Amino acid sequence: MSKDEHKLPLSKRKESIIFMMILFAFQVFMVVLFSVWVRYSKNEVNYSTLTPEQLQELEATGGVVQEEVTNIYGYFRDINIMIFFGFGFLMTFLRRYGYSALGYTFIISALVAQWSVLIYGFFETVDHKNDHGGDYASTFEMSQTVLLQGLFCAGAVMISYGAVLGRVTPLQMLVVGIFEPIFYFLNMFIGEMNLEAIDVGGGMYIHLFGSVFGLTIAWFLTDKKSKDCEDNSPSYTGDYFAMAGTLFLWMMWPSFNAAIAPLGEPQFRAIANTFLSLTASTIATFIVTRLFGHLGHKIDMVHVQNSSLAGGVVQGCLAHMNINPGGAIGMGFLAGVISVIGYLFISPFLQRRFNIQDTCGIHNLHFMPGFIGSIAACIAAWKGLNDRSLYNPIEFNQIFRAGEDQARNNAAATFISIGIAIAGGLFVGMILKALKKVGGLKAKQYYQDSAFWHVPIDYPKDVEYVVEQNNLPMPTTDNGDNVVGGGVEMKKHNNNNNKKENGYRRDLIRLLETLVRNEQSTDSSYSDSDSSDEEEKERRIRKLAKKSYRRSKKSHSEHQPQHQPEESTFNNNNNNNNNNATAETTDNGGSSTNSPTSKV
C-alpha cells in the first residue's frame, strides 16, 4: 500500500487540525486565567496576632482547610473513580467502540474538570456580590469543594455523551465539553444559589439536566444510517467490561450522594438511603428483565448494567432527608421497574416516533429516575415543613434553606432544569450538526474506533471484510437474541451472472438457515430449549433466513453477486434434499474453508 493511501481524507485532516488547535488554545486560556484569577483556599487567620499556643493548635489541626480535606477527600476519590472508570467502562459494551468510550470519557472529563473551576467561580462571585454587595472579588479561592463540583459537572457531560455514543467525532465532543458546563452552572446558579432547591446528589442538576441535554443533541445526530448500523450492538467481552463499570458505580454511588450533605445525621442518611435504594433497584431489575425477557424469560445484560443503578439516581435529590428506610427501598424498587420498562418499550418509541436514538439509554437510567426523585423531593420537603419533628433544629436549617417556600422552589427548579437543558441542547445540537460537514462520520464509520484511533491487529473485523473473505453474508445478533444478516453488502463480480435469481435466493436462504443453526449450537441461550419447541424453532429459523435475504437484497439491490457460492458449500451430498444439505453443512462447517463459521 502506498504512502498516500495511509493519509486521512482532507475532511478528516481538517477535523484533526481544528480539534488540536481548539484544545491547545483552551489549555493556554486555562493557564492564563488560573494564574491571574484563581488562588488556593487558605485558613482565614492573621498569623501575626496568634499566640504560640494558637499557632501550635493550628499546626496540629491544620485549620479549616485540613478539616475540609479530611471530610471531603474520601468522597472526592470515590467520585473520581465513578467518573473516569465507572462511566468510561459502562460505555464499552459496543463491539468496536471501546477505545472511544474510554478515551473520550478521559479527555472530556479532564477538560470539564478544569473548565468547571472557572465557570463555578464566576457564578459564585456573582452570587456573593448579590448577597453581600460591594465590588466583585479580584480573585477566586479554589477549595476541595470546588474541585468536587467540577467532577459533578463532568458527570452531567458524560451522561449526555451516552445518548450520542458512537455517532460523534472528537471535535464534536470537544464542543459539548466546552458549552455544556456553561448551561450546567447557569442552571445551578438559578436553582442552587438563588432558589436554594434541595438536591444533595445531583438528581436535578446532574441526572435530569444531563439526560435532557443529551437527548436533545441526539435528536440532531440521529439518522437512518446510524439506526440501521450493524456495529450498534454489544459484544460478549464488551459486556464484561461494561459490567465492571456498573459494579464500580454501584459501590461508589453512596459517596456520590453523600459528598456535599451536611455532616452528621444527614450524611449518614444519604449513605444509608442510597445503598438501600440501590439494592432494591437491583432486585427489581432481575425480576422485570426475566418477566419480559426474550426467548423464555432470559436475563438481559443491558438491563442489569443500567437499571440496577436507577436506585442511586432516584435518591439524588433527597438522599439526606428523613424518608424512612422503607421509603428508600420502595423508591429504589420503583425506579428499577420503570427503568427496565423504559429500555423495553419507551426507548424504541422515542426512536420510532421522535427520531431520538439513545445509544446508552440515558432516558431510562437518568431521566425517568431523576424526574421521579425530583418530584419525591418536593413531597418530602412539604412533609418536612409540616412535621418538623423529623429533623433536629440544626439539620432542619441546613436542609430547608428556602424555609416555607422549599417545596415550591424545588418544583420550580425541576422544570427550570428541563427548560435550560432543552435550550442548551438545541444550541449545541445545531453546532454539532453543522460540524458534521467538517470530518463528520460516514455511514460505515458509526460505532467504530478505527475512524479516529490506531487499532491493533486483533481489532474486531468489519462486516464487509468478513463478507469479502467468505463471499457470503455474515449474520449478527440483534437485541432479541435472534440471528439476522440484514444490511450486509456482499462482494460481487461481473463474470458469473448466468444463474437465475431464484436459484441463488434458494441457496442463500439455505445457507443462512445453516448459519442460524450453527449460532444456536454454540450459543448457550438456545441450549436449554425444550424439545417440544423444535417445530417452532424450525419455523423461526426459516423466517429469519428469508428476512435476512430480503433485507440484504433491498439494501444493496444495485450490486450483482461477485460469484455464485459453490454447490458443495450448501449441499455436501444431495442438492435435492434441503434438510440433508443443511445438516451436512452444519456438521462440516468448521472443516471447509468455503463454509463460514458462526464465530469470525
Swiss-Prot record:
GO terms for biological process: ammonium homeostasis; ammonium transmembrane transport. Residues 519-529, 571-580 have a biased composition (Low complexity). Its main location: membrane. Keywords: Glycoprotein, Membrane, Transmembrane, Transmembrane helix, Transport. The keyword Ribonucleoprotein does not apply. It is a multi-pass membrane protein. The chain crosses the membrane at residues 17-37, 74-94, 103-123, 146-166, 171-191, 200-220, 241-261, 275-295, 304-323, 326-346, 362-382, 412-432. Residues 540-554 have a biased composition (Basic residues). GO terms for molecular function: ammonium channel activity. SUPFAM superfamilies: Ammonium transporter. Residues 581-600 have a biased composition (Polar residues). Glycans are attached at residue 46. Residues 38-73, 124-145, 192-199, 262-274, 324-325, 383-411 are extracellular. Pfam families: Ammonium_transp. It is found in: Membrane. Belongs to the ammonium transporter (TC 2.A.49) family. Rh subfamily. This is Rhesus-like glycoprotein B. It comes from Dictyostelium discoideum.
